[in-house]
From Swiss-Prot:
Protein name per its UniProtKB record: Polymerase basic protein 2
Site (described: Mammalian adaptation): K627
Protein's organism: Influenza A virus (strain A/Swine/Iowa/15/1930 H1N1)
Motif extent (Nuclear localization signal): 736-739
GO molecular function, one term: RNA binding
Name of the encoding gene: PB2
Amino acid sequence: MERIKELRDLMSQSRTREILTRTTVDHMAIIKKYTSGRQEKNPALRMKWMMAMKYPITADKRIIETIPERNEQGQTLWSKTSDAGSDRVMVSPLAVTWWNRNGPTTSTVHYPKIYKTYFEKAERLKHGTFGPVHFGNQVKIRRRVDINPGHADLSAKEAQDVIMEVVFPNEVGARILTSESQLMITKEKKEELQDCKISPLMVAYMLERELVRKTRFLPVAGGTSSVYIEVLHLTQGTCWEQLYTPGGEVRNDDVDQSLIIAARSIVRRATVSADPLASLLEMCHSTQIGGIRMVDILRQNPTEEQAVDICKAAMGLRISSSFSFGGFTFKRTSGSSVKKEEEVLTGNLQTLKIRVHEGYEEFTMVGRRATAILRKATRRLVQLIVSGRDEQSIAEAIIVAMVFSQEDCMIKAVRGDLNFINRANQRLNPMHQLLRHFQKDAKVLFQNWGIEPIDNVMGMIGILPDLTPSTEMSMRGVRISKMGVDEYSSTERVVVSIDRFLRVRDQRGNVLLSPEEVSETQGTEKLTITYSSSMMWEVNGPESVLVNTYQWIIRNWETVKIQWSQDPTMLYNKMEFEPFQSLVPKAARGQYSGFVRTLFQQMRDVLGTFDTVQIIKLLPFAAAPPKQSRMQFSSLAVNVRGSGMRILVRGNSPVFNYNRTTKRLTVLGKDAGALTEDPDEGTTGVESAVLRGFLILGKEDRRYGPALSINELSNLAKGEKANVLIGQGDVVLVMKRKRDSSILTDSQTATKRIRMAIN
């Protein structure tokens, strides 16, 4: 207060004011500070001082012809004196106002296209709804978030190539546009920006906003998708939050969300197949998300989620070095440990072999709804500081940390046997066994842990075994904090390896991820996910399997038909028929298969009995290992819609209905595609007798040379194929039969096959 009084007294003397405003600054150190280097030392002051002058702005000389000397109010707009050191003229800020009001206008058609991200943001805010403001403690944790809604996911280098190609197409320099998205964006932008007068540099900046994901490490309490982050300053402060619903979604958030759902489904499906890694790769390569190949998205999208990271690891991409346990991301912040195998006894006297981490280590644990700092020694939890949204979330974090600590009292708290299995019916590893056990019920764990009196530390309170807060006592080593623990900020990625069972390890051999860590949460994807792989047909239930199997046969009928006649075993073993087997009652699978295979063999042997529709209908049943029996069936059962439905061997049924007029197949009322051939029963024809002893495979195939006449056919060796000219100038591909026994002397017709091949 004394100082302020003294200053007030000084300021009241006119001499003081004069010294401060009039005298020159001639202290060398000060002059040096403000004049050395090109960097402006006090931009705000400089701006105020410049704008206080009459003509602070320089402009091109041509401006004098365009702008009058005075405006309507008679104020001077430009000075006749030239700018010292350049051939520009000095103009007043009023000249800018005049220009904005009366200057030349250009077409504005390109503005919404160039400033697309801004226009879209304005729309989102216009349609967004802001709710009430709540005051209270905000648990914010720093997370790496996307701050730029509405962007594509190109790498900086890819975006640079696109921008150069769009904005400066004639510049020299090697630009290789390879990815699908690069080519698509370049084409679209070139069309949009024809005759655009906006400065190329501005266009380049705006394109960068649209093409590249920008992330920042920001304190966030609520939603982390980019449409929430763009209003972060409006929705959360130090002690308040305002509820907000965005007025629109952006594709990049939808891609992130749909990618996670697709990756989870794929990992879950791969786990139960014979070769999980090969299956996972096959599915990633054949899946599209919102029309873009999933593998392209994985290469570009930095989303860190367990299933997504497993898919990336399988593709040989680098991922974050943090590891996952119990749905929490662990990052070691200090200390080290060595791993040793140890046998321990549970409270039920069951022996578990666990890999014990020996040594003192500190970790941060970050989950969706809780975060923690964990300090542990060998099989001992030293300290755990947790913060979370609610009691449930805090409990989850405590359970995971207690199991991770490998303490003896945790293992002794196990009641009953541990026999949890994964989706593929394999036993989980011991650490996940323990985790599942206590996630089901942690009462005994918390009761046995022990409690201790606590010191009064600012911002920390204790938590009792029944999860009530306390300022006097707490579970041993466990404290609740008001402050969140920040997510690991580094974007460093490491090389990892993945084994056949989808366990991901770093180069030291530490397991970072495994399928057990993949969340079971099912969401509804925002973008359409198209799983082309037959392994994913069952994701949407039995009906989807049925429809997809028949659609696949129809789509590939040309090749299926040839395999059916030449190499049926290979056809029956196709993985596309695997999902179908789960629909066939277990007891009947082998018998159905034997029956259908016998039927097919008769069709191959007896000319004129080939029936396209019947082959398509029964083919999936032939894929199971066959049982030899003399049983005949008039219908075959499939388990869909919660009960057994039947497919008629001859004729239509609600499950499989072929309309001969429209040539379309409906499966369970859903359209399964059209047959391009005419599978009608054929009438007798001239060619029948001549073509006995030959198998008609299909349409002409040029690889087998020019069409032979019917007379030339006799020269073919058994098993040899040739194109042959029949009837009214039609050409079909035939093969001379390998077995004479199958040549029937009666003239049962081959017409049916001929007609099928021609139409």
